[in-house]
Swiss-Prot record:
One Gene Ontology term, aspect cellular component: plasma membrane
Pfam families, A to Z: YidD
Main subcellular location: membrane
Protein name per the record: Putative membrane protein insertion efficiency factor
InterPro entries per the UniProt record, alphabetical: Membr_insert_effic_factor_YidD
NCBIfam families: membrane protein insertion efficiency factor YidD
Taxonomic placement: Bacteria, Bacillati, Bacillota, Clostridia, Thermoanaerobacterales
Family: Belongs to the UPF0161 family.
Function as written in the Swiss-Prot or TrEMBL entry: Could be involved in insertion of integral membrane proteins into the membrane.
UniProt entry keywords in alphabetical sequence: Cell membrane, Membrane
Keyword Membrane: yes
Record's subcellular location: Cell membrane
Membrane topology: Peripheral membrane protein
Keyword hit for Transferase: no
Length: 71
């Protein structure tokens, strides 16, 4: 895993620990969008995995059916 990938994953993990607990869980998918981002970046690399994570976050809204959506 490259250094930029590790940095991006570290930032997401930091968000999960420091910021996310203060807000109610609203993600419509499993795994959550932030966990999906970690998995996608680890599996596909920073650029391709990051793009997949952005698309996933854009699909996560109140009108989305959600459900199981693995990376």
């Amino acid at each position: 895993m490259s250094r930029p990938q590790k940095l991006a994953i570290g930032l997401i993990k930091g968000y999960q620990v420091a910021i996310s607990p203060f807000f109610p869980s609203t993600c419509r998918f499993y795994p959550t969008c932030s966990e999906y981002a970690v998995q996608a970046i680890g599996k596909y690399g920073l650029m391709r995995g990051g793009l997949r994570a952005v698309r996933r976050v854009l699909r996560c809204h109140p009108f989305s059916p959600g459900g199981y959506d693995p990376a």
